[in-house]
């Protein structure tokens, strides 16, 4: 999405940067992992296909993607590629419902899991979508056996609205309100820096 192509979102322990060509090779390595393919509902791509997808996503008006960097690694290495730990996306995939977005989060780097990097990243992404893209309802589709991700979204106030046995996924939604936005901002302010 061109809207976020020059946007950098600084959090306490993460930085969100637009998905660029320099990130593709490492992203492609992550996506060779069968578990990540399953959890994200992704098909394996060749490196060439991954580069083509990155270019398409940059042009698509309905996809907003950020690569998640570990802020502490980035500060010490000054390398976005070395600091990459995952990605977060907003898909505005229903034109008749232009103010609804599907939100996704993936922490691909196993060493970065369990450190609340996903929590901080998804809150930053949702705030961006609400404030910059005028999103007023968020939706998450999660594999039914991905208990950690389901728990994160429930903790964020999302409620289950559907379940698909065929796709083995649960759909959760959250209506945006000013009270909830204030709550999200308070959660961001309560995140403490850790350099681990």
Regions found by a protein language model. Give the residues of each.
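Acyl-donor (CoA/ACP) binding surface of acyl/acetyltransferases
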Residues: 2-19, 23-24, 30, 72-196
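Generic structural signal for well-ordered secondary structure
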Residues: 20, 29, 43-47
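Charged/polar, solvent-exposed surface patches and flexible loops
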Residues: 29, 38, 52-56, 182, ...
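A short gly/proline-enriched turn/hairpin at secondary-structure junctions
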Residues: 36-44
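A general structural signal for well-ordered secondary-structure junctions
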Residues: 36-37, 63, 159
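Active-site rim helix/loop that mediates acceptor-substrate recognition in acyltransferases
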Residues: 43-78
